[in-house]
């Protein structure tokens, strides 16, 4: 079979986020399945016959019974740390509970964060080609796909998810590898910091399942202050959050202090750049002739850009550090939680994309070389 004939069926698009996996068929508008990228294992003894079957829970089932389970994320900062669990999750995507299809029938478009170790991509290819017999594979950078979803060919994408934040400048469809910036500060770090702040208020969330409660508190009540110093001096309105056991828990200044780590990683003792610096450095590393255009086409993507006040805060930080008359435009598409997946769905269904796939035959002939030759 020629590599070009491989792509007859609808490709499967998997946006492999550190926090949430989005998967579905190319050409559709939204991902068919979306579930947390973790595995749950029972931490108690099963004493009744006919109780919950199985020793490993994935997807909605793990979410539903999380109080019984010890929860582990197989990905940390965009890099797979536990391949056995990651492969279980990928196999589950094809099960009858999710896409209900056969692995050997569909090419796979997989997303990954830029500047990831090469080994990460090689192991993924090994699983899809050798483990589940996929006919073809392509590994694409997340930010490029987000730009596809907005219908632009020029812009700088600031993508901040659960594990990684990165900025990728793209001009007329060309990504500039030397200008890509990445920091490993993202949503999960905000959740961890919020957990610490909540502990100071007298609530201790210890277990891995309770960490998920902190995550949902973050998603519901946290916001970014345009001026954090000013915000500290005024009384923050307390928000009453109802915990799963019915207790009411009041959260005050932690609401804006937690997301602050995105702009000030030093609060966590990290020495890396804040999210606004990542964006600016990435633009400044691009060619001088392109900078003005890039500043006018900043596109936000990923769940951590959904904090209330995120766009305003980013704009005020950029204005502080740039020329007075510089025009800055930030586009925040409403569907940015899914924009990487949507871009993948558009890309994989294009006719011109067919020659980009790495076919199983190419992989068998060239091995890992094929993966690096055909992916950016």
Curated annotation (Swiss-Prot):
InterPro entries, A to Z:
Actin (IPR004000), Actin/actin-like_CS (IPR020902), Actin_CS (IPR004001), ATPase_NBD (IPR043129)
Among the record's GO biological process terms, what is one? retrograde axonal transport
Name the protein family.
Answer: Belongs to the actin family. ARP1 subfamily.
Taxonomy, top ranks, is: Eukaryota, Metazoa, Ecdysozoa, Arthropoda, Hexapoda
Which coarse location class describes where this protein primarily resides? Answer: cytoplasm
The organism's superkingdom is given as Eukaryota
Gene responsible for this protein: Arp1
Name the UniProt record assigns to this protein: Actin-related protein 1
Which PROSITE patterns does the record cross-reference, listed alphabetically?
Answer: ACTINS_2, ACTINS_ACT_LIKE
Q: Where in the cell is it found?
A: Cytoplasm, Cytoskeleton
Assigned keywords, A-Z: ATP-binding, Cytoplasm, Cytoskeleton, Nucleotide-binding
Please name the GO terms that the record assigns under molecular function.
ATP binding
- An example of a Pfam family matching this protein is Actin
Task: Output the Gene Ontology cellular-component terms.
Answer: axon cytoplasm; dynactin complex
Q: Which CDD domains match?
A: ASKHA_NBD_Arp1
Keyword Cell inner membrane, does the record have it? Answer: no
């Amino acid at each position: 079979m020629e590599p070009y004939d491989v792509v007859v069926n609808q490709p499967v698009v998997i946006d492999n986020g550190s926090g949430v996996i989005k998967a579905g068929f190319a050409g559709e508008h939204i991902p068919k399945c979306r579930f947390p990228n973790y595995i749950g294992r029972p931490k108690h003894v099963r004493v009744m016959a006919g109780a919950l079957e199985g020793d490993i829970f994935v997807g909605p089932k793990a979410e539903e019974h999380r109080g019984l389970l010890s929860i582990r994320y197989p990905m940390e900062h965009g890099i797979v740390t536990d391949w056995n669990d990651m492969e279980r999750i990928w196999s589950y995507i094809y099960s009858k509970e999710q896409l209900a299809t056969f692995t050997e029938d569909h090419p796979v478009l997989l997303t990954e964060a830029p500047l990831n170790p090469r080994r990460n991509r090689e192991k993924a290819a090994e699983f899809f080609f050798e483990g589940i017999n996929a006919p073809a594979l392509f590994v694409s950078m997340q930010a490029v796909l987000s730009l596809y979803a907005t219908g632009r060919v020029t812009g700088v994408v600031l993508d901040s998810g659960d594990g990684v934040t990165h900025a990728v400048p793209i001009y007329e469809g060309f990504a500039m590898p030397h200008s890509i910036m990445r920091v490993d500060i993202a949503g999960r770090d905000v959740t961890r910091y919020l957990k610490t702040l909540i502990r100071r208020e007298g609530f201790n969330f210890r277990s891995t399942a309770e960490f998920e409660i902190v995550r949902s508190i973050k998603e519901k009540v946290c916001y970014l202050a345009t001026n954090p110093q000013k915000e500290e001096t005024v009384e923050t309105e307390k928000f009453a959050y109802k915990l799963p056991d019915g207790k009411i828990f009041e959260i005050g200044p932690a609401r804006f202090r937690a997301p602050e780590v995105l702009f000030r990683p030093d609060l966590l003792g990290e020495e890396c750049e804040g999210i606004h610096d990542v964006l600016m450095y990435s633009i400044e590393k691009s060619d001088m002739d392109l900078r003005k255009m890039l500043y006018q086409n900043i596109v936000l993507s990923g769940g951590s850009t959904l904090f209330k006040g995120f766009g305003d805060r980013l704009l005020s930080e950029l204005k502080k550090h740039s020329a007075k008359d510089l025009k800055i435009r930030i586009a925040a598409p409403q569907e940015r939680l899914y924009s990487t997946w949507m871009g993948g769905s558009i890309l994989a269904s294009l006719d011109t994309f067919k020659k980009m796939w790495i076919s199983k035959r190419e992989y068998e002939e060239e091995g890992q070389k094929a993966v690096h030759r055909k992916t950016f």
